[in-house]
């Protein structure tokens, strides 16, 4: 079934988001199962599976997600915060995603983050990527501006908008926004 994302979908989401607590809102989007579909652009790895079933996180799926979202520079694997996974699930549902998230950056080791801060502008020295609480991504078929808007409306954390680099940053830190 093809889902069409439009302004009406965002309006409905916007009307529901303030009145439902975040966990209750997540439950409204999925009855008994939360699934993620990911494609790491640096490693080529793909994953499409439920990570939460009937109120419990699935340990094997979480381990596989941690591996797919590892630091591609150092091959270091770290635990990804389940709140970030829940945020991705809610965003996927909000925009009616039919394709996997394309991952630019998931977990980032301190060594990789230091390298990026020295060679790239706009990289935070204390990035939430190093805690498994942030991700840079895009979603084929969904305009970046719509992905950004979904992140803003869900108020799950920080939303950075990088249209010149073709990605959106999402994290589960404090609610804030930056970028074009």
Which residues does each PLM region occupy?
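Structured segments of extracytoplasmic/periplasmic soluble domains
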Residues: 68, 87-98, 119-122, 140, ...
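Acidic helix-start/capping segments at beta-turn-to-alpha-helix junctions
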Residues: 100-114
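Catalytic cores and adjacent binding grooves of peptidoglycan-active enzymes
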Residues: 2, 34-39, 122-180
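Extracytoplasmic/secreted envelope proteins and their assembly/folding machinery
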Residues: 85-89, 113, 144, 148
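N-terminal secretory signal peptides and thylakoid transit peptides that target proteins
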Residues: 1-18
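C-terminal segment of N-terminal export signals and the immediately downstream linker at the start
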Residues: 22-51
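Charged, often glycine-rich, active-site loop that binds/positions anionic groups
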Residues: 110-127
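Active-site acidic/histidine clusters and adjacent loop/turn architecture
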Residues: 54-104
């Amino acid at each position: 079934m093809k889902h069409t994302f439009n302004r009406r979908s965002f309006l409905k989401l916007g009307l529901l988001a303030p009145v439902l607590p975040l966990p209750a809102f997540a439950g409204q989007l999925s009855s008994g199962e939360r699934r993620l579909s990911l494609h790491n652009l640096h490693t080529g790895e793909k994953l499409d599976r439920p990570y939460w079933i009937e109120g419990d996180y699935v340990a094997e799926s979480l381990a596989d997600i941690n591996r797919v979202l590892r630091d591609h520079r150092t091959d270091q694997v770290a635990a990804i915060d389940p709140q970030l996974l829940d945020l991705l699930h809610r965003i996927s549902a909000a925009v009616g995603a039919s394709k996997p998230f394309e991952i630019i950056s998931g977990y980032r080791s301190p060594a990789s983050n230091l390298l990026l801060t020295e060679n790239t502008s706009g990289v935070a020295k204390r990035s939430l990527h190093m805690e498994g609480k942030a991700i840079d991504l895009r979603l084929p078929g969904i305009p970046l501006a719509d992905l950004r808007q979904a992140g803003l409306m869900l108020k799950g954390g920080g939303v950075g908008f990088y249209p010149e680099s073709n990605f959106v940053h999402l994290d589960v830190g404090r609610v804030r926004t930056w970028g074009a």
